[in-house]
């Protein structure tokens, strides 16, 4: 049995697909209100803030994946994320399962240094400090050595379905709505983006590779970073739209934060858009040279095809 904790987020749904498709896994999906991804999935409703519910959710599991998400609310992150993670670690240790932690890069310095798995944590802002604390909790569990543990870390997403990211919200969702794309701060800095299904495929592969444990892995991205100018140009071409976008500077974003909690919560992430983002996934590519990485063009074409198919179904309804 392989169990996904936090199974409602997009990365978890893609992970469920991959585990069933490529590893024929008996799969349990756990969240407050889980829904099947595959016909054979077992569903379990659980509150990860409750230790006993978390323990019950992972019983008889061989591998436990932690992919839980929360809304971008710093207070919520500080109160709930460490508790959820500690409950998951305790429960996994108690049943003797493997633990796979899906992570992001919020704890990394927001500058142009090349990011490798041994990059020191230098979090900026409350959410970054929470993610650093959580990563350290997992690293401590790894050092404890009682259960096999690994970390799979991803940069910013773009992708299908309900993928949540700046890139989806400001570029891709706006193209779908017939609006001009927006770019945060600069369109000439290099970005490293990961196609959500690639992140999930890689996480499933790591979880089912015995010698991957005891390590942190950067999940695989395209070889060459891309500027937002290049990415938006490709997206406009795929969507058949005029190649045009607007660059949002800090002033309107900060003004928006005065009146709305959403922009205010995301402001701490803005410095990363002023510098190149160079996320190095060469370690994964060296260990898994046959892993197929989706190019930006392929990802955009897949997303466009999915959107058109969904739009057609909605019209029929």
What are these regions (language model features)?
Residues 155-165, 185-197, 221-223:
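Glycine-rich "substrate-gating" loop/helix at the edge of Rossmann-like oxidoreductase active sites
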Residues 173-194, 205, 211:
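A conserved pocket-lining segment of Rossmann-fold NAD(P)-dependent short-chain dehydrogenase/reductase
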Residues 151, 187, 192-200, 216, ...:
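Conserved loop-to-helix N-cap of the C-terminal "lid" that shapes the substrate pocket in Rossmann-like
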Residues 2-22:
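N-terminal Rossmann NAD(P)H-binding glycine-rich loop of SDR-like oxidoreductase domains
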Residues 35-95:
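NAD(P)H-binding glycine-rich loop region in Rossmannoid oxidoreductase-like domains
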């Amino acid at each position: 049995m392989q169990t996904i904790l936090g199974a409602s987020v997009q990365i978890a749904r893609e992970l469920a697909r991959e585990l069933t498709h490529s590893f024929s896994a008996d799969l349990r999906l756990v969240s407050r209100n889980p829904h099947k991804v595959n016909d054979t999935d077992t569903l379990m409703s659980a509150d990860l803030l409750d230790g006993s519910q978390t323990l019950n959710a992972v019983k008889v599991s061989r591998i436990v994946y932690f992919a839980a998400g929360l809304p971008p609310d710093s207070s919520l992150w500080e109160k709930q994320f460490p508790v959820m993670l500690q409950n998951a670690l305790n429960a996994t240790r108690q049943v003797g399962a493997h633990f796979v932690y899906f992570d992001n890069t919020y704890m990394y310095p927001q500058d142009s240094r090349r990011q490798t798995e041994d990059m020191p944590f230098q979090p900026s802002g409350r959410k970054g400090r929470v993610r650093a604390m959580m990563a350290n909790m997992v690293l401590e569990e790894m050092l404890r050595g009682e259960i096999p543990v690994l970390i799979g870390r991803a940069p910013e997403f773009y992708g299908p379905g309900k993928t949540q990211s700046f890139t989806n919200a400001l570029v891709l969702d706006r193209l779908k709505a017939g609006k001009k794309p927006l770019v945060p701060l600069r369109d000439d800095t290099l970005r490293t983006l990961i196609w959500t299904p690639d992140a999930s495929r890689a996480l499933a592969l790591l979880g089912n590779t015995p010698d991957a444990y005891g390590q942190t892995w950067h999940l695989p991205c395209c070889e060459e970073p891309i500027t937002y100018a290049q990415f938006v140009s490709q997206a406009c071409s795929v969507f058949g739209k005029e190649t045009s976008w607007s660059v949002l500077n800090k002033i309107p974003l900060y003004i928006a934060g005065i009146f709305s909690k959403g922009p205010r919560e995301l402001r701490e992430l803005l410095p990363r858009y002023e510098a190149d983002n160079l996320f190095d996934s060469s370690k994964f590519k060296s260990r898994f040279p046959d892993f197929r990485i989706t190019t930006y063009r392929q990802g955009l074409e897949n997303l466009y095809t999915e959107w058109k198919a969904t739009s057609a179904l909605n019209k029929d309804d």
